Amino acid sequence: MKVLGEASSYPYRSCIIVVFLSVSLFWLRPSTYHPQQQNLNPENVTRLESENETKTNYIIRFKQYKPAKDHRIYLESKVRSGGWGWIERINPATKYPTDFGVLWIEESGKEAVVGEIERLEMVKDVNVEFKYQRVLLGGSFPDGKKRPGKIFTSMSFEEGTESSPMADTSNTTLNWSRHLLAQKTQVTSMFGADHLWKKGYTGAKVKMAIFDTGIRADHPHFRKIKERTNWTNEDTLNDNLGHGTFVAGVIAGRNPECLGFASDTEIYAFRVFTDAQVSYTSWFLDAFNYAIATDMDVLNLSIGGPDYLDLPFVEKVWEITASNIIMVSAIGNDGPLYGTLNNPADQSDVIGVGGIDNDDHIASFSSRGMSTWELPHGYGRVKPDVVAYGRDIMGSKISTGCKSLSGTSVASPVVAGIVCLLVSVIPEARRKDLLNPASMKQALVEGAAKLSGPNMYEQGAGRVDLLESYEILKSYHPRASIFPSILDYNDCPYSWPFCRQPLYAGAMPIIFNTTILNGMGVIGYIESPPTWHPANEEGNLLSIHFKYPDVIWPWTGYLALHMQIKEEGAQFTGEIEGNVTVKVYSPPASGESGPRRSTCSLQLKLKVIPTPPRAKRILWDQFHSIKYPPGYIPRDSLDVRNDILDWHGDHLHTNFHIMYNMLRDAGYYIETLGSPLTCFDAQQYGTLLMVDLEDDYFPEEIEKLRDDVINTGLGLVVFAEWYNVDTMVKMRFFDDNTRSWWTPVTGGANIPALNNLLASFGIAFGDKILNGDFSIDGEQSRYASGTNIVRFPAGGFLHTFPLLDSSESGATQNLLLTEASKEDPAVLGLLEIGEGRVGVYGDSNCLDSSHMVTNCYWLLKKMLDFSSSNIKDPVLFSKFAKRYSPVIIDEKQLPSRRTDVNFSTYSSVIGKELICESDSRFEVWGTKGYNLHVRGRNRRLPGYHGIDLGRGLNFTVESKRPTRWRSAKEGGELSSSRSKSLGGLFNRDEIDMPFLVPTRWIVLAGVVASGVLVLLSIWRIRQKRGRRRRASGSNRLA
């Protein structure tokens, strides 16, 4: 019996060991924090997390300028909450009144403190203080990790160095011997500056503010360094990097080997960047205020970045120009990509400068337009304003001697030097009456030489012509004008993209967005609605709706033309010419009795054709695209490591411009819809093209699209992108600009939303991230971080390819690999349903010119031929690809929305009104759309919670407690309530985990299941032994 007792206790000991191992495996799992994935240096992790949990700096903007101590006393007397303090700023601006203060606020009570401050009568707003890091935008994300600081463009760079942006994407071919010769040519002589020098104009008595890295007081290249100020936290006025010195040399250097344009210009060096190229918003705001107080004439800022929603910075730039300071800024070094304009150069009141090489070609590094502020309902403005030489420009070294640098941050001081020279042309007594940001821009753009080849969104008005601008200023009288002043459909390629597609009746409005330059005053008004004056009878076929601001301030405004051909012009072929005039007036200047008035004119030369057949018309969905700013929208291709943001606009005329040209070459006509899908008439279009979309859909849109396809015969082509919760979790990082965690709002595309849209067609995408090369009928293509098709109806054609799935870790693959998962994933599907046809593909990188490896324009054309004209390519519609049974997946296995992020902040759908905006046909403006001509109502879809839209526009605020939870597979993290129910073992932030959440639970479940099996075995053994004892006892009794 003793031996039996020892043996029987063994299973119990085994059970205890199994349970112990189960708990240990979970508790000793890989750390949930991984510095590399959080994009922070290990030594900084603890400090940054600690700072994030304790104190955050906020900028408090006031409605009035007062001494800083008065603002501090006001806050201390009004704010009753604790946990905050005033931060003293010791700098040269201290002696002047200010309109802002900087506070530290403890994280634990920030909501109460910020709310109380925002309700104060004298407070304008409250914003998190930003930190700026001046680095190449493409280099802001080494190995896919964000560097500390706000994303900004690079300083200038030396050719051939690693810092040369886009070195492998240059679109310029240079003759090397000529290149070396040109390198020795003075940039001043290339613009003819010596002609003005001979007339005695050298920039005298012009106050030039250089916002950069400082300058040395005893530098021999400069005649008049009037003042040096330091706005950083470093105790030095000197330039230890060399960039500020170089910029000053281009503007005002006097060394014969690297002459500046205006050697007698008075230099005011504002050191706003540290030696590590770091700056803070408050430093800029103080320095800007000081520039205003000390009455600067010109200001050069050779920086820029994509965030045009940093309101304290943007609005302070407006205040700078409103104070009659002419600001010049670099347009950015993110070329040759389109849609990459940098702020503040993209503001209409700033002179934005692009770069050209010595052969008058647009430099490969120079950012291209259009501006993207206006999307999706409007259209971008023309930027840059002008271009200037920016490759191998000679300038001053840090202490003595000369060197050459390249970049738009070099082209910017070239123009700033020209501006200083032009300012000195006007007698000092008349300068403030004649010169201002608008009149100087008028002189530059009207005098510029248009280059042959580049379009208006690459070169603006063209190359700066110093002597022509000089002639304009000599006879200048205050007036208003429009830029560009002409839209000519015969002037291709300058008028691209307009000249690529004629107008026709029934199309969505063509929007042309112009800038009003008001040289008459800082404030102006439109006297009466703009007027269209056709040059001939045919001009009456054109219908124009105008949009313009109530007030033109500071110095600039906009005039947007929304143009349609009337229905009676459906068969017209020819040209329409005429002028649009707009009358502008400003208050009288000092000594004048009446307002200043001016009539601006915009010349139109438009081509019109008969309305194309339905099969040749494509509608592009712009409305459901979300970009940065304001949301953290991750890159589409995860292989691209130097750019983590999707910020190029995703527009036909930005990063999809090559695709647009291809479709036009193929005979298709493409129109843009910036409103919901209820706002177009499906009978007019062969195909709705939906590419790389991140937003959700109104229920009315889903219902209408189903009817449009099945009953109206609309074709539908969808190019999706990756969506994987675990990958999005890993892309989360702590941003020391905003002292907050950034997490992707969605994946490369919003797959859960697309699946809702496609559900009525029996189609759904999955959450795999697929990569690899494949070919169809000899056409090679690269699948770059695309998704898979997991649901597809019978009767359609579905194509699979052997692609690598990078969405699973090695551990997950080992555990979950089954026979079914070894099948090649489906990525391309074609389907006839009802009267319409649908084509879906899981990757859009092959259409996006920003980070394309190989294009798939050939595939897009085949899909459009099918969806619009029912032309079936024999390879795509091979019998081997036909599905005789549906591909089915359980609803619970489909990718689900993330409920731990405030998606409504960035969405045009969630919590918003369904309404057709001014980009849609005139007849449905302000309605819910076709057959729904009533005002829309706010809609909130299930699974989303509302938030305060007044703050947090530049980052994603994560919910501490997700509102609901479905499964680890669907959402990727546990609810906090569930965590607490397990004895506090799971109280860490699960969203930080680098190890896949489903994997961990499967491992744990496997171990626990093993333990349960052991217990069952023990129970069965005991049952058998019990029966044996009873049987033995019965036998003895017998």
Swiss-Prot record:
<dbReference type="InterPro" id="IPR015500">
    <property type="entry name" value="Peptidase_S8_subtilisin-rel"/>
</dbReference>
<feature type="glycosylation site" description="N-linked (GlcNAc...) asparagine">
    <location>
        <position position="300"/>
    </location>
</feature>
<keyword id="KW-0645">Protease</keyword>
<dbReference type="GO" id="GO:0000139">
    <property type="term" value="C:Golgi membrane"/>
</dbReference>
<dbReference type="InterPro" id="IPR023828">
    <property type="entry name" value="Peptidase_S8_Ser-AS"/>
</dbReference>
<dbReference type="InterPro" id="IPR055143">
    <property type="entry name" value="MBTP1_N"/>
</dbReference>
<feature type="signal peptide">
    <location>
        <begin position="1"/>
        <end position="30"/>
    </location>
</feature>
<feature type="glycosylation site" description="N-linked (GlcNAc...) asparagine">
    <location>
        <position position="902"/>
    </location>
</feature>
<keyword id="KW-0378">Hydrolase</keyword>
<keyword id="KW-0472">Membrane</keyword>
<feature type="glycosylation site" description="N-linked (GlcNAc...) asparagine">
    <location>
        <position position="230"/>
    </location>
</feature>
<dbReference type="InterPro" id="IPR036852">
    <property type="entry name" value="Peptidase_S8/S53_dom_sf"/>
</dbReference>
<keyword id="KW-0812">Transmembrane</keyword>
<feature type="glycosylation site" description="N-linked (GlcNAc...) asparagine">
    <location>
        <position position="175"/>
    </location>
</feature>
<feature type="topological domain" description="Lumenal">
    <location>
        <begin position="182"/>
        <end position="1000"/>
    </location>
</feature>
<feature type="active site" description="Charge relay system">
    <location>
        <position position="409"/>
    </location>
</feature>
<feature type="glycosylation site" description="N-linked (GlcNAc...) asparagine">
    <location>
        <position position="52"/>
    </location>
</feature>
<dbReference type="GO" id="GO:0004175">
    <property type="term" value="F:endopeptidase activity"/>
</dbReference>
<feature type="glycosylation site" description="N-linked (GlcNAc...) asparagine">
    <location>
        <position position="579"/>
    </location>
</feature>
<dbReference type="InterPro" id="IPR022398">
    <property type="entry name" value="Peptidase_S8_His-AS"/>
</dbReference>
<feature type="transmembrane region" description="Helical">
    <location>
        <begin position="1001"/>
        <end position="1021"/>
    </location>
</feature>
<feature type="propeptide" description="Removed in mature form">
    <location>
        <begin position="31"/>
        <end position="181"/>
    </location>
</feature>
<feature type="active site" description="Charge relay system">
    <location>
        <position position="243"/>
    </location>
</feature>
<protein>
    <recommendedName>
        <fullName>Subtilisin-like protease SBT6.1</fullName>
        <ecNumber>3.4.21.-</ecNumber>
    </recommendedName>
</protein>
<keyword id="KW-0333">Golgi apparatus</keyword>
<dbReference type="Pfam" id="PF23001">
    <property type="entry name" value="MBTP1_N"/>
</dbReference>
<dbReference type="GO" id="GO:0042538">
    <property type="term" value="P:hyperosmotic salinity response"/>
</dbReference>
<feature type="glycosylation site" description="N-linked (GlcNAc...) asparagine">
    <location>
        <position position="954"/>
    </location>
</feature>
<feature type="glycosylation site" description="N-linked (GlcNAc...) asparagine">
    <location>
        <position position="513"/>
    </location>
</feature>
<feature type="topological domain" description="Cytoplasmic">
    <location>
        <begin position="1022"/>
        <end position="1038"/>
    </location>
</feature>
<keyword id="KW-1133">Transmembrane helix</keyword>
<dbReference type="InterPro" id="IPR057060">
    <property type="entry name" value="MBTPS1_3rd"/>
</dbReference>
<dbReference type="Pfam" id="PF00082">
    <property type="entry name" value="Peptidase_S8"/>
</dbReference>
<dbReference type="GO" id="GO:0006972">
    <property type="term" value="P:hyperosmotic response"/>
</dbReference>
<comment type="similarity">
    <text>Belongs to the peptidase S8 family.</text>
</comment>
<feature type="glycosylation site" description="N-linked (GlcNAc...) asparagine">
    <location>
        <position position="171"/>
    </location>
</feature>
<comment type="function">
    <text>Serine protease that catalyzes the first step (site-1 cleavage) in the proteolytic activation of various factors, prior to site-2 cleavage. Part of a regulated intramembrane proteolysis (RIP) cascade. Cleaves BZIP17 and BZIP28 after the Arg-Arg-Ile-Leu (RRIL) motif. May cleave BZIP49 after the RRIL motif. Targets the membrane-associated BZIP17 factor, which functions as a stress sensor and transducer in a signaling pathway that resembles an ER stress response.</text>
</comment>
<keyword id="KW-0325">Glycoprotein</keyword>
<feature type="domain" description="Peptidase S8">
    <location>
        <begin position="175"/>
        <end position="473"/>
    </location>
</feature>
<keyword id="KW-0732">Signal</keyword>
<dbReference type="GO" id="GO:0005794">
    <property type="term" value="C:Golgi apparatus"/>
</dbReference>
<dbReference type="GO" id="GO:0006508">
    <property type="term" value="P:proteolysis"/>
</dbReference>
